[in-house]
From Swiss-Prot:
Its cofactor is a divalent metal cation. The active site is at residue 72. It holds the Pfam family Maf. InterPro entries: ITPase-like_fam, Maf-like. It is an enzyme of class 3 (hydrolase). It comes from Corynebacterium aurimucosum (strain ATCC 700975 / DSM 44827 / CIP 107346 / CN-1). It catalyses: a ribonucleoside 5'-triphosphate + H2O = a ribonucleoside 5'-phosphate + diphosphate + H(+); a 2'-deoxyribonucleoside 5'-triphosphate + H2O = a 2'-deoxyribonucleoside 5'-phosphate + diphosphate + H(+). It comes from the Bacteria. This is Nucleoside triphosphate pyrophosphatase. The lineage of its organism: Bacteria, Bacillati, Actinomycetota, Actinomycetes, Mycobacteriales. Keywords: Cytoplasm, Hydrolase, Nucleotide metabolism.
Amino acid sequence: MRLVLASQSPSRLSILRGAGVEPVIAPAHVDERAIEERLAGAEPAEIVCALAAAKAEAIAPDYPEDVVVGGDSMLLLDGSLQGKPHTPEATVERWHAQAGRAAELITGHCVLYGEERFVEASRTTVHFAQASDADIEAYARTGEPLECAGAFTLEALGGWFIDRIEGDPSSVIGLSLPVLRRALYSFGLNVSEFWAQH
């Protein structure tokens, strides 16, 4: 039995590897925009969980004996969900809006094991620094935040511009280890079953 990650996110992979798990990488290709449009007006946690579920469900038939994990993160700022900025210009715009403020990073998780299903969202408050314009522009030019929810990373260059977080750090990076542990326990599995042999 293996843990299969329905994502090509380097951050999610690094969380699992750092926690002793060498997952199978099986990126799911889903129409995220269509799901977001279908759920327009829904609660933020419902949206990120639906996106996580779509990813896990897309690949689960190929891994019937394994545990499949899907995840999706978005930043909630001023009542609006912010996904990935995709461009340096959008990154700079996002940072001007969130610098010096607090926002909520919501990560949806969907964990599948055979016919069993565990879905949970985790919420972490992120306090953004009042970064200088020069640093915001330089950060955007690196390309690092372009494919990250909220236009930042906690574990790399973006860490310079985060004053503090309240909640689970692994959730901010892309997958909550406490949520995954609860999912595995709900299936009658132990975390240590997935640790790579040393």
